[in-house]
Amino acid sequence: MRKHLLDHLKTRKILGARIAKGEKTEQDLINLNMAPQVFMFKNLFSGQVLYSQVPAFHQDQIDEQFTRPNWENRKPSRRNDLWRIMCVANFENYEYAIAAYKGLVQLRQVRDVVQKKEAKALRKKNDEGNVWFSGQYRPTYSQEAVADLSHVIDEFELEGTSVMWESLWRKGEDTHWRSDLVEHDTLPPFNPRDQTILLDELRAKAVEEFANLRQQAQQSEQQSQSELESQTA
């Protein structure tokens, strides 16, 4: 039974990685039965954060999001055991989710390439003037990812957003978030080895909720149309 479970988990990870390859359009996400979400994975070794439109990740995403690696910001390994879900952002529609994902990736590229010196100047330093670290772990990267998520939601005014965190302290102070746009909650407790199962369950739940909301909106629109027609008859 245990061997069967492990084989099943391995299959899901492989399939998930294949699905994660390439940037997704709205139709791609619908065809894959994905919800309007963005998944943020934290590297346990380095503190770096990886963004994904689906509940999995691919080497192509790592290559795209870490374009200028150096000794302080090395290109991370794709090893599944090094990545843990930090948060899952649920958006009101696919347009919002795609805008948020692209915004997060672009902000990372600006910080690492276009404004590299400016970004480093803002980071906490050690006595030698390097980005502060403990071992190989640099907390500044996850802090920047959280700040970027807040900025993207604010800048694009992505109302109806909800974010589920591994721990609420990750989001920082409430003053950094617009309460009229986003709500916060915690992820259900889970065993790290069952992460793929949890994320797939969150995906399925979000797909169902999105379908229900869309159906309600269509029914409301039809009702309004019927009332308008009866008034003009």
From Swiss-Prot:
Keywords: Mitochondrion, Nucleus, Ribonucleoprotein, Ribosomal protein, Transcription, Transcription regulation. Its main location: nucleus. The keyword tRNA processing does not apply. GO terms for molecular function: DNA strand exchange activity; single-stranded DNA binding; structural constituent of ribosome. Coiled coil: none annotated. Transmembrane segments: none annotated. InterPro entries: Ribosomal_mL67. Belongs to the mitochondrion-specific ribosomal protein mL67 family. This is Large ribosomal subunit protein mL67.
